[in-house]
């Protein structure tokens, strides 16, 4: 099912980078950015995590970002632990929630992204986010979902390319209203 404004998502239960089991229902009462990323070694995904981490304090204390990668936990630890992120990073090894919420894969859009987002790709690699292994679907297009304190979807963005996300400015506006 595709996520729409006004929806309430079912509970998502996945292993977290910190070793615990995360449940989406634990975020009720906070504003939330839920993002479905590609595989753990994705340079653009890791650059986005880095950007969110740098801006995290400006989102306010009643905000949480939840990052879901199509990866097994060991691979996720290998590529994302260095972030020391102040938010949960989850492993959906079996692509279960990606399928449930109609997260798309597209080879043409993947290839197009390699052209139009080459600057982000190179920046990610320069920062050390080098995709040595491809464990997970490389053609997955990200999805960002902003959810209010009551668990209701307010904004949803199904990406048109690998670097297409809700802007940091929009997240700040959402979290500070």
PLM region spans:
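Short secondary-structure boundary/capping segments
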Residues: 1, 24-26, 57, 135-137
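N-terminal "domain-start" segment that seeds a small globular fold
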Residues: 1-25
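A structure-centric signal for secondary-structure junctions around beta-strands
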Residues: 9, 21, 28-30, 62, ...
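Short active-site neighborhood of thiol/selenol oxidoreductases, capturing the structured segment around
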Residues: 24-52
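Short beta-strand/turn micro-motifs composed of small residues
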Residues: 37, 69, 148
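Structural microenvironment flanking redox-active thiols in thiol-disulfide oxidoreductases
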Residues: 48-100
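Thiol/selenol-based redox catalytic cores and closely related redox-interacting motifs
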Residues: 92-163
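A short, polar/charged loop-to-alpha-helix boundary motif
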Residues: 162-177
